[in-house]
Swiss-Prot record:
Organism for this UniProt entry: Oryctolagus cuniculus (Rabbit)
Listed name of the protein: Cytochrome P450 2C30
Keyword Oxidoreductase belongs to the record: yes
E.C. numbers: 1.14.14.1
Cofactor: heme
Chain's gene name: CYP2C30
Function statement: Cytochromes P450 are a group of heme-thiolate monooxygenases. In liver microsomes, this enzyme is involved in an NADPH-dependent electron transport pathway. It oxidizes a variety of structurally unrelated compounds, including steroids, fatty acids, and xenobiotics.
Membrane topology type: Peripheral membrane protein
Family designation: Belongs to the cytochrome P450 family.
Gene Ontology CC annotations of this record: endoplasmic reticulum membrane
SUPFAM superfamilies (UniProt xref): Cytochrome P450
CDD domains in alphabetical order: CYP2C-like
Highest taxon, organism lineage: Eukaryota
Length: 489
């Protein structure tokens, strides 16, 4: 009985502390829905479609408001003006990164995703420099993507127009492009090592986008309980072992005067800084950076392609117009190239509309403020989590009339020319914008046009019965599983 009383008193104290902390914080933070002790607003949000819940809250509280995930407040930025004002006009102050417990367990503040301050700035600057040296934005990387697109066509022809799930093959394309940058070589799709690498990344995507992992990131204490996070950490460990072996191979054959790939550049950077006790370019940092480049360079691009094929099957009239433009501009005798894009406004508009419509990262990768800041009349304390709602920008009704409709006309003017939009932010904006945006744009254009140059997409059901709704709309929009037939043209 005495123990029970002690437990009740302890729980009551925890609730009281939680209430007092929330009450004090709310005096300065933007308004928002009333949060419950300990769990915050978690029970008031639709886990499968957080962006929809946020849109409803924005109608009540305005473009800047506060929600609590557990006991931690997150300031939501809703609409283009609020997002731009924070991430661009106050870019430095909003350039921090939230600690995501599941990532922090293995990253420990290292890499491109989880690092902060000067380490992040130096890592991002170094990564972009190396990627440019490796040919990003140049003909050399375009050649690699074209080669990979040709290999994909060969693999798709081997399906003999039979029903197939395209997810694994579509993941192989950007993954192999990244392999050529990181390791200097690509893999055959049936290579067992490559198959294992692809499986690990697909498993990590599947596991991370589960309800349990969202709960884990809100309540890290769950780490000590059974759950799928243990399986995810095993996948991470297997990936790190693979990368460690690749690094060891590179160390044995490293030529400081002739770097071959991303790993060589990182090893040379480490060697130059080995006498600098302040340097954070450690082996662990190298490993996590490689993982981050792989993940960012493969996951969202392949998922966008999966969504793209699904949407083109649902709208065969749009796919037919793209194929007409491909036939007129490129023909059948050569591979698509980036120079073609300026002559293919409809295809360009379709690819932009795919990215807008699928809303790949609805609430962006969470930011944090790097210092106390006055923003729109509110004091946001240093370290506060920031959720920029990209959904609210990509689905802005004034910029994109009928945003719920898949319509390439959103990116075409009255004359049928391609029309840019400042609201097109699938890669985010500001200092933490996706470092691989240029690479992703090239891959999407070259791979999708190459597929449609060689195949007609045949669904297994009536197009009107195709449902492109994501199976999960939490951190990432995950495409539903489906099969189709790639019929040679």
């Amino acid at each position: 009985m005495d123990l029970f009383i002690v437990l009740v008193i302890c729980l009551s104290c925890l609730l009281l502390v939680s209430l007092l902390k929330q009450s004090y914080a709310r005096r300065k933070l933007p308004p928002g829905p009333t949060a419950f002790p300990l769990v915050g607003n978690v029970l008031q949000l639709d886990r499968k479609n957080i962006s929809k819940s946020i849109s409803m809250l924005a109608k009540e509280y305005g473009p800047v408001f506060t929600v609590y995930f557990g006991t931690k407040p997150s300031v939501v930025l809703h609409g283009y003006e609020a997002v731009k004002e924070a991430l661009v006009d106050h870019g430095e102050e909003f350039s921090g990164r939230v600690t995501v417990p599941v990532f922090d367990r293995y990253a420990q503040g290292a890499g491109l995703f989880a690092s902060q301050g000067e380490l992040w700035k130096e890592t991002r600057r170094f990564t972009l420099t190396v990627l440019r040296n490796m040919g990003m934005g140049k003909k050399t990387i375009e050649d690699r993507i074209q080669e990979e697109a040709s290999c994909l066509v060969k693999a798709l022809k081997e399906t003999n127009a039979s029903p197939c799930d395209p997810s694994s093959l579509l993941f192989c394309v950007p993954c192999n492009v990244i392999c050529s940058i990181i390791f200097q070589n690509r893999f055959e799709y049936n290579d067992q090592t490559f198959q294992t690498l692809v499986k690990h990344f697909l498993d990590s995507i599947r596991l991370f986008n589960t309800p349990w992992m969202q709960l884990y990131n809100t309540f890290p204490i769950l780490h000590y309980l059974p759950g799928s996070h243990h399986e995810l950490f095993k996948v991470f460990n297997d990936q790190m072992k693979f990368f460690s072996e690749k690094i060891r191979e590179h160390q044995e054959s490293l030529d400081h005067n002739n770097p071959r790939d991303f790993i060589d550049y990182l090893l040379i950077k480490m060697e130059k800084e080995k006498h600098n006790k302040q340097s954070q370019f450690t082996m662990h940092h190298l490993l996590v950076t490689i993982w981050d480049v792989f993940d960012a360079g493969s996951q969202t691009t392949s998922s966008t392609m999966q969504f793209g094929l699904l949407l083109l099957m649902k709208h065969p009239e749009i796919a037919a117009k793209v194929q007409e433009e491909i036939e007129r501009v490129i023909g059948r005798d050569r591979s698509p190239c980036m120079q073609d894009r300026s002559c293919m406004p409809y295809t360009d508009a379709v690819i932009h509309e795919i990215q807008r419509y699928i809303d790949m990262v609805p609430n962006n990768v969470p930011h944090a403020v790097t210092q106390d800041i006055q923003f729109r009349g509110y004091l946001i304390p240093k370290g506060t989590h920031i959720l920029p709602s990209l959904t609210s920008v990509l689905y802005d009704e004034k910029e994109f009339p009928n945003p719920e409709k898949f319509d390439p006309g959103h990116f075409l003017d009255a004359s049928g020319n391609f029309k840019k939009s400042d609201y097109f932010l699938p890669f985010s904006i500001g200092k933490r914008a996706c470092a691989g945006e240029g690479l992703a744009r090239m891959e999407l254009f070259l791979v999708l046009t190459t597929i449609l140059q060689h195949f007609t997409l045949k669904p297994l059901v009536d197009p009107k019965d195709i449902d492109p709704t994501p199976v999960d709309n939490g951190f990432l929009s995950v495409p539903p599983s489906y099969e189709l037939c790639f019929v040679p043209v």
